[in-house]
Amino acid sequence: MAALPMLWTGLVLLGLLGFPQTPAQGHDTVQPNFQQDKFLGRWYSAGLASNSSWFREKKELLFMCQTVVAPSTEGGLNLTSTFLRKNQCETKVMVLQPAGVPGQYTYNSPHWGSFHSLSVVETDYDEYAFLFSKGTKGPGQDFRMATLYSRAQLLKEELKEKFITFSKDQGLTEEDIVFLPQPDKCIQE
């Protein structure tokens, strides 16, 4: 049971940064005229969807985390995520580098020895953002993950439906999707 918090931590980072993968072939769509300055601030990881069998097995054990997005000195983003781990609040910082197109970022994971790509596909900046990662876990193993960021901890039903549609548009199914419950600590409104 002690391994569950570590698995949760890894999955939160998956949602934020994508799965350890090889560089993506081509680029996913990105929010038109993405404005990084409007994307900054506090977000909650409110929904995740993935075609990973591990994710499907563990998704019911996950909780919402809080991420503060700030500009990095290199023009990218610093993501400071706070989450519940072993019944204590833990914070991790990740730096996303710009990938040429506004709204697209890369991250090199020393832990996994891998390269990640992350795209902000759609956002209204004030209420929600849809992020998407894709790649391969190995020969012939396709991986996709959609993430719903929300400015509020409680989601409107319309936003849930919109995320379900977005996830299905990425080739994911209803059973691939989870809306994360709020933990009893570690995040603030």
Swiss-Prot record:
GO terms for MF: fatty acid binding; prostaglandin-D synthase activity; retinoid binding
Modified residues (Pyrrolidone carboxylic acid): Q25
Gene Ontology cellular component terms for the protein in this record: extracellular region; extracellular space; Golgi apparatus; nuclear envelope; nuclear membrane; perinuclear region of cytoplasm; rough endoplasmic reticulum
Tissue: Abundant in the brain and CNS, where it is expressed in tissues of the blood-brain barrier and secreted into the cerebro-spinal fluid. In the eye, it is expressed in the pigmented epithelium of the retina and the nonpigmented epithelium of the iris and ciliary body, and accumulates within the interphotoreceptor matrix, photoreceptors, and aqueous and vitreous humors. In the male reproductive system, it is expressed in the testis and epididymis, and is secreted into the seminal fluid. It has also been detected in the cochlea.
Signal peptide location: 1-24
Induction pattern: By IL-1 beta and thyroid hormone. Probably induced by dexamethasone, dihydrotestosterone, progesterone, retinoic acid and retinal. Repressed by the Notch-Hes signaling pathway.
Pfam families found in the cross-reference section: Lipocalin (PF00061)
Active site per database record: C65 (nucleophile)
Catalytic activity reported: prostaglandin H2 = prostaglandin D2
EC supergroup of this enzyme: isomerase
EC number(s) stated in the UniProt entry for this protein: 5.3.99.2
InterPro entries in the cross-refs: Calycin, Lipocalin, Lipocalin_CS, Lipocln_cytosolic_FA-bd_dom
Compartments, as annotated in UniProt: Rough endoplasmic reticulum; Nucleus membrane; Golgi apparatus; Cytoplasm, Perinuclear region
UniProt keyword list: Cytoplasm, Disulfide bond, Endoplasmic reticulum, Fatty acid biosynthesis, Fatty acid metabolism, Glycoprotein, Golgi apparatus, Isomerase, Lipid biosynthesis, Lipid metabolism, Mast cell degranulation, Membrane, Nucleus, Prostaglandin biosynthesis, Prostaglandin metabolism, Pyrrolidone carboxylic acid, Secreted, Signal, Transport
S-S bridge residues: C89-C186
One GO biological process term: prostaglandin biosynthetic process
Glycosylation sites: N51, N78
Function noted in UniProt: Catalyzes the conversion of PGH2 to PGD2, a prostaglandin involved in smooth muscle contraction/relaxation and a potent inhibitor of platelet aggregation. Involved in a variety of CNS functions, such as sedation, NREM sleep and PGE2-induced allodynia, and may have an anti-apoptotic role in oligodendrocytes. Binds small non-substrate lipophilic molecules, including biliverdin, bilirubin, retinal, retinoic acid and thyroid hormone, and may act as a scavenger for harmful hydrophobic molecules and as a secretory retinoid and thyroid hormone transporter.
Subunit composition and interactions: Monomer.
UniProt remark on domains: Forms a beta-barrel structure that accommodates hydrophobic ligands in its interior.
Protein known as: Prostaglandin-H2 D-isomerase
Organism: Rattus norvegicus (Rat)
Gene: Ptgds
